């Protein structure tokens, strides 16, 4: 068996649903630990639950991992393809009298469980078949012969030392009556044979760990290091679930979050480096360590994630932001714009946008030469006297030579001075003429991006709209 020298971590999801926030954080921590130590990150799909495992879920998990940028060095390895190996190792334990066949029925076990609870005892298999030396037969399970004395110590890299009395541990089932290995057995064989040196997983697995350590010892395997990550809670301090909002990684993609924002947020759910909030992936790889993961549960804060997403939208490479916007425009029926026009739109909108959905939805006026005018805004701002001011703007623009951002700013200031009005008098009417609404990027930015011809045409259309009486 391979000695545990190289750092090798793994992520081993069950393909029974989508990749959720908790699993993604576990994968991220395992990935970062491997990358920090120049080790290997292995992806294993634990698909031995034949009834619940689906190809669709497997694809969704792989897509989510890829979107987050968590590339794997080996795999995906499918656990179901290794069942013959698991069965061979179970036979080895039976042959060595470290496991035995059990014929106790589920009804009998349930009755014993109820009796133990009624008598104030912790439910535990009573060893009925432990010394019977039963042969294999249809419907039997295989149980591991757990030591009945001594203490098993888990030297957890996050939680510290945890001790378990062996007498409190069951003779756990390692092969079900259908012939398939149980989770606790298959995971030990797979981790050992794949040379996994560090098992980083959620703390709901803490109680599995002493049983797994005993299995490692019985099979003659090196025992890996374990690190159990505290769970993620909602704002109400209950375990994170759908009632707290989206929990699927790809749901956040669909809502317009950037993968860098989600990765940055997930790593801060339990891990910290001083007061630093924003980390590049290279920084995370350089700084990450299990010793900086807190022992208490982390609370999921959607507002903080939104703040991070807004930061990344502001700082994302322009061409990359234009690229990731395309699917959201497509959903709105908007064709991909000319690259130069698209970049200008991105520059206009990125400062205010919190998500890519926000960005796409607030950009529609750039693609519609007759943007729908908000009725309430029209009633408030598009008064008859405004028509004259807008008409003057359109006429003066036609002869404007310097149609740059600075030139537009000077033009607007000069025009309001000449007409003895304040800029705010025409700012909102002009904004409505160009966009149909009262909230948008700066006027000079919009005018520069739309171009002189579009701006003049939209102003003239709005003047006609006012004089037709439609604004009142």
From Swiss-Prot:
It is an enzyme of class 6 (ligase). The keyword Protein transport does not apply. GO terms for biological process: glutamyl-tRNA aminoacylation. One of its GO terms (molecular function) is glutamate-tRNA ligase activity. Zn(2+) binds at residues 102, 104, 129, 131. InterPro entries: aa-tRNA-synth_I_cd-bd (IPR045462), aa-tRNA-synth_I_codon-bd_sub2 (IPR020751), aa-tRNA-synth_I_CS (IPR001412), aa_tRNA-synth_I_cd-bd_sf (IPR008925), Glu-tRNA-ligase_bac/mito (IPR004527), Glu/Gln-tRNA-synth (IPR000924), Glu/Gln-tRNA-synth_Ib_cat-dom (IPR020058), GluQ/Sye (IPR049940). ATP binds at residue 242. It catalyses: tRNA(Glu) + L-glutamate + ATP = L-glutamyl-tRNA(Glu) + AMP + diphosphate. A motif ('KMSKS' region) lies at residues 239-243. Its cofactor is Zn(2+). The keyword Phosphoprotein does not apply. Its EC number is 6.1.1.17. Keywords: Aminoacyl-tRNA synthetase, ATP-binding, Cytoplasm, Ligase, Metal-binding, Nucleotide-binding, Protein biosynthesis, Zinc. It is found in: Cytoplasm. A motif ('HIGH' region) lies at residues 13-23. NCBIfam families: gltX_bact (TIGR00464). Belongs to the class-I aminoacyl-tRNA synthetase family. Glutamate--tRNA ligase type 1 subfamily. Monomer. This is Glutamate--tRNA ligase 1. The gene is gltX1.
